[in-house]
């Protein structure tokens, strides 16, 4: 995997920095693990915009990823690594000894042909998935469940990881990349190692059109709008007149919006600002 800065042969190429990935599969994805993915344009069933800045973009199939890793005790090997347009991480096609194939998030340093396994007795090795009560304190993991059997929810993007800080009773304490320290049930599963493709953050798209290919539409500043459209709109010259807020008036900087008090007891330390 290498970082390549394109030559300025045109205005659209001048600022492009891309990640070259010769290890990824060049052909089509495995058809048995694809699903139709329909575009919404950011609209709900009433036709109203519920998520701004979404629309257009290239057609994509959704890849069914195995976030549960519940095929215990059956050895498997990485058949190939693939690009996934639906996430920043790459994915790996896994072939199990019984002939079944599944997609998983591609861990760092894993390559085609490497063996992996899931289950309580799995060795502590990158790519293996097991309950966190069986993983030593201090280990770096990813694809962490928040409820046993629900499937991975934490540390799934490119380069993401979580460190196990302690184990006490029915819970383990995790340090997340955000700086938050929280408790999760020790029966929850995690995959050993980090998510691969950490170089994803170094790429530069180089032009607005590259975002349009991805289905991302332009973001207009509130100060450039009229008063009817945004709290920052209108006025003479460039003047907000108020503290920075969202289009709906919620303070945009430093304001706490977390409302799930039921799970506050599991957060040992809030994330770093």
From Swiss-Prot:
GO terms for cellular component: large ribosomal subunit. GO terms for biological process: cytoplasmic translation. Residues 229-239 have a biased composition (Basic and acidic residues). It holds the Pfam family Ribosomal_L2_C. Residues 222-273 are annotated as: Disordered. One of its GO terms (molecular function) is rRNA binding. The keyword RNA-binding applies. Keywords: Ribonucleoprotein, Ribosomal protein, RNA-binding, rRNA-binding. InterPro entries: NA-bd_OB-fold, Rib_uL2_dom2, Ribosomal_uL2, Ribosomal_uL2_bac/org-type, Ribosomal_uL2_C, Ribosomal_uL2_dom3, Ribosomal_uL2_RNA-bd_dom, Translation_prot_SH3-like_sf. Coiled coil: none annotated. Belongs to the universal ribosomal protein uL2 family. One of the primary rRNA binding proteins. Required for association of the 30S and 50S subunits to form the 70S ribosome, for tRNA binding and peptide bond formation. It has been suggested to have peptidyltransferase activity; this is somewhat controversial. Makes several contacts with the 16S rRNA in the 70S ribosome. NCBIfam families: rplB_bact. Part of the 50S ribosomal subunit. Forms a bridge to the 30S subunit in the 70S ribosome. This is Large ribosomal subunit protein uL2. It comes from Tolumonas auensis (strain DSM 9187 / NBRC 110442 / TA 4).
């Amino acid at each position: 995997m290498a970082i390549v800065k394109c030559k300025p042969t045109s205005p659209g190429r001048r600022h492009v920095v891309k990640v070259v990935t010769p290890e990824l599969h060049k052909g089509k994805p495995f058809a048995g693990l694809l699903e139709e993915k329909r575009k919404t344009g950011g609209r709900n069933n009433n036709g109203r915009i519920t998520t701004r800045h979404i629309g257009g973009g290239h057609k994509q199939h959704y890849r069914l990823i195995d976030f549960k890793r519940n095929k215990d005790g059956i050895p498997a090997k990485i058949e190939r690594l693939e690009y996934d347009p639906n996430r920043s991480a790459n994915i790996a096609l896994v072939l199990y000894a019984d002939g079944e194939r599944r997609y998983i998030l591609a861990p760092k340093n894993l390559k085609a042909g490497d063996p992996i396994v899931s289950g309580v007795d799995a060795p502590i090795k990158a790519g293996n998935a097991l309950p966190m009560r069986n993983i030593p304190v201090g280990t770096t993991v990813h694809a962490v469940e928040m409820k046993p059997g629900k499937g991975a929810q934490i540390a799934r993007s490119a380069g993401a990881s979580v460190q196990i800080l302690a184990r006490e009773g029915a819970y383990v304490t995790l340090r997340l990349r955000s700086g938050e320290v929280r408790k999760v049930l020790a029966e929850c599963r995690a995959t050993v190692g980090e998510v691969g493709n950490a170089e994803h953050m170094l790429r530069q798209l180089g032009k607005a059109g590259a975002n349009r290919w991805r289905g991302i539409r332009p973001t207009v500043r509130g100060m450039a709008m009229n008063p009817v459209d945004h709290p920052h709109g209108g006025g003479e010259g460039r003047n907000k007149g108020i503290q920075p807020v969202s289009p709906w008036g919620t303070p945009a900087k430093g304001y706490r919006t977390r409302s799930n008090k039921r799970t506050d007891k599991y957060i040992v330390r809030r994330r770093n600002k």
